[in-house]
């Protein structure tokens, strides 16, 4: 399955109710962030980064949970099972899926240092990525909308952490120049 097919398969069109809920959620977040800016609790950069994070996470949750078709409860509880299958069976589609899972939460890792307006530790970034992924995976299991697997949680957390490390390094380099 190529990236386009993955996007088409897992990103079904949103219903009217989903669009309204998404819009109301973002409007509420925007109002709260604007008040925080007005009261000088957050800088413009922090407000923009926080709003971008809210938009991104809304889209991620929508595409990984809410727009998926209900099936049966599926789970894979063996960590790194996908890497074993990739190595053993040369399953390149599974490798692509693992890499895409690493990429999925990279935008979160990029935004974290801007939200806190400072460097964000890699341990905290890993914890944030794992936490977000755990919510996604548990929701998929509870609502029967996908496969719960530890590999996704590990890959998502790793991607978030890696992106945060790179962003911290770029910010440090930019501040030196």
What residues fall within each predicted segment?
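Bulky hydrophobic segments
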Residues: 1-145, 150, 164-177
């Amino acid at each position: 399955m190529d990236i386009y097919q993955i996007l088409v398969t897992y990103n079904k069109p949103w219903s009217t109710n989903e669009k309204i809920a998404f819009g109301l959620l973002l409007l509420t977040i925007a109002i709260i962030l604007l008040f925080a800016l007005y009261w000088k609790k957050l800088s413009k950069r922090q407000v923009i980064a926080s709003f971008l994070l809210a938009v991104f996470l809304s889209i991620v949750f929508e595409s990984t949970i809410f727009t998926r078709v209900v099936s049966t409860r599926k789970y894979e509880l063996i960590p790194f099972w996908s890497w074993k299958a990739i190595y053993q069976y040369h399953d390149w589609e599974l490798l692509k899926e693992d890499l895409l899972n690493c990429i999925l939460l990279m935008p979160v890792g990029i935004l974290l240092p801007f939200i806190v307006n400072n460097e964000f530790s890699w341990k905290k970034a890993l914890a944030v990525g794992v936490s977000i992924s755990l919510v996604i995976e548990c929701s998929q299991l509870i609502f029967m909308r996908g496969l719960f697997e530890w590999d996704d949680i590990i890959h998502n957390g790793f991607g978030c952490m890696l992106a945060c490390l790179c962003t911290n390094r770029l910010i440090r380099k930019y501040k030196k120049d």
